[in-house]
Amino acid sequence: MLICIINPNTTKNMTERIETVANKVASNGTTIVATNPKNGPESIEGYYDEVFCIPGILEEVFSNKEADAYIIGCFDDTGLDAVRTVTNKPVLGIGDSSYHIASCLAGTFSVITTLDVSIPILKNNLLKRGFD
């Protein structure tokens, strides 16, 4: 199985670390490839940055069509819904996945962020997925 993790920002160092760690925990027979857009913000800090990330994220999906699944490597799930519209393969967001796992483990859960600008995105993501 080949899983492509897309880091929506352009920080190559972060992308390399994601790939290294993911391959260390991957099951036998699973290969992880991490990639990031060539152009866009170095950091995603709100809806403004998200707008500039999505074209590059989609480009990475089209460049990695051999992947069996995609993971959006950003807790804001930047571009998650857009990627799901261009492929029939599984697409997971690390934020979305975390919410679902947390809801299975506890009756209630909290999301903690270090950036005030992320709060509206995270709230919206939770509401879209049926969490309030």
What are the language-model segments listed below?
Residues 54-107, 111:
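Glycine/small-residue-rich loop that forms an oxyanion/phosphate-binding "nest" at active or ligand-binding sites
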Residues 1-55, 114-132:
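N-terminal glycine-rich anion-binding loop in soluble enzyme alpha/beta folds
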